[in-house]
Amino acid sequence: MKYEIQGEPMPVVICDLESGEPMITEKGSMVWMSPNMEMETSAGGLGKAFGRMFSGESIFQNIYTPRGGPGMIAFASTFPGSIRAVQIDPSHPIVVQKSAFLASEAGVELSVFFQKKIGGGFFGGEGFIMQKLSGHGTAFLEIDGHAVEYNLAPGQSIVVDTGNLAMMDATCSLEVRAVKGVKNMIFGGEGIFNTVVTGPGRVVLQTMPLTAFAGAIASMLPYKQ
């Protein structure tokens, strides 16, 4: 596969494929393709389908394969931001926000990732259930807003508002913690829970998660009873 990412802040990734070379994507990500692309919808097995449903994703995934020669297919972001290509291999799985996966080569496997410490997880918003990408191949991630990357040393931590965590290496650990102090919770305006990511590993943060954008817009709309 060869690919090119174009057009921030509303990006698209255009993939050129060899005949018979499949790609997988979530429902609704394809925006254009060559006529010889064949689509097949698959749940990928009961366990994987249940996991995607539990994480809030579509049960089904679409598999696109060029037939009779090379093909082309394009996948677009659903929100202003960027598309990031990440290389996955068996020794380098990653964990991503459940809405971040856009498309990948067929060798990439998706599964549900749970925090080991779930004390505040049920209330921590988007960070409780995430997706793990493993296997082998290139995956394309959808980043809301601008992407900022940090490389954490072993034991080094960063505190993140939960929705702003877009991706981390699977070597990192994740914990949702309540904000200290009742006054801070009530009057701080920063939410009740934060996510603490601890290295070693890479962390990619996003500056404008969709939930924050939707909340800002909703606060400006006239209230109707």
Give the ranges of each region predicted by the language model.
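Composition-driven recognition of glycine/serine/threonine/acidic- and proline-rich low-complexity segments
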Residues: 1-225
